[in-house]
């Protein structure tokens, strides 16, 4: 068994990747990276600098100072250039811009080394859309976490309502559907399960069941000589 393990978890928006990966990272004291957040970080920079030119953003992305920390409660905190930006990355405008940034081939290429080396020399678990297919095609374990559109929309709606936001589930469902279509059809690194990924459908699983299902896959990997 390699000293540094790299776990790739891919799947559509709302499947529970972040919750599951944070829990596993905390359990094993591994590094964790939400790869979608690094695109949000680039989007935040683009909005702040009012610069949306692909080459310029790619140059900035290649040198950006970004890290994730998971606290004792299992919550992830994002830091950009030493400043916590967790809440800013969740802004709706940042999210929409991130989707545009993620479709820029030069930006995706610039961020590849960052993702591949993240957390070294620690073992690491990464979640995203193309981790197992593009970022870590040689990952020690690949998981494709998915759920029905209805289940994902329901979870996202409850999450936002829990934060005091007034949202329509129909609108959330429509946005997720649009995001799915965009992620699956983009020319560069479209969302897809790696051929050797293990699929976990969380549609009818509770949060705890989803975490334990993935944790069992990780435990099986750790038991290998």
Curated annotation (Swiss-Prot):
NCBIfam families, per the entry: cmk
Chain positions recorded as ATP binding sites: 11-19
Catalytic activity: CMP + ATP = CDP + ADP; dCMP + ATP = dCDP + ADP
UniProt xrefs under Pfam families: Cytidylate_kin (PF02224)
Protein's name in the database: Cytidylate kinase
UniProt-annotated location(s): Cytoplasm
Family under the similarity heading: Belongs to the cytidylate kinase family. Type 1 subfamily.
Any GO CC annotation of this UniProt entry: cytoplasm
Segments for region (Disordered): 169-195
Compositional bias segments (type: Basic and acidic residues): 169-185
GO molecular function: ATP binding; CMP kinase activity; dCMP kinase activity
The keyword Cytoplasm belongs to this UniProt entry's keyword annotation: yes
């Amino acid at each position: 068994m390699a000293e540094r393990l790299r776990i790739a978890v891919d799947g559509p928006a709302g499947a529970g990747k972040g919750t599951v990966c944070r829990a596993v990272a905390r359990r094993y004291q591994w590094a964790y990276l939400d790869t979608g957040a690094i695109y949000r970080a680039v989007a935040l920079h683009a909005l702040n600098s009012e610069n949306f030119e692909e080459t310029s953003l790619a140059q900035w992305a290649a040198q950006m100072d970004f890290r994730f920390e998971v606290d004792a409660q299992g919550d992830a905190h994002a830091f950009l250039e030493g400043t916590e930006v967790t809440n800013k990355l969740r802004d709706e405008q940042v999210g929409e811009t991130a989707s545009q940034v993620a479709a820029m081939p030069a930006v995706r290429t610039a961020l590849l080394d960052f993702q591949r080396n993240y957390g070294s020399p620690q073992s690491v678990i990464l979640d995203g859309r193309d981790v197992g297919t593009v970022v870590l095609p040689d990952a020690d374990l690949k998981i494709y976490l998915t759920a029905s559109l209805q289940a994902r929309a329901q979870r996202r709606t409850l999450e936002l309502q829990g934060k005091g936001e007034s949202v329509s589930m129909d609108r959330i469902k429509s946005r997720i559907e649009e995001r799915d279509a965009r992620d699956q059809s983009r020319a560069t690194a479209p969302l897809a399960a790696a051929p050797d990924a293990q699929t976990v459908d969380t549609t009818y699983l509770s949060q705890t069941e989803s975490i334990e299902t993935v944790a069992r896959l990780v435990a099986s990997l750790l038991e290998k000589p």
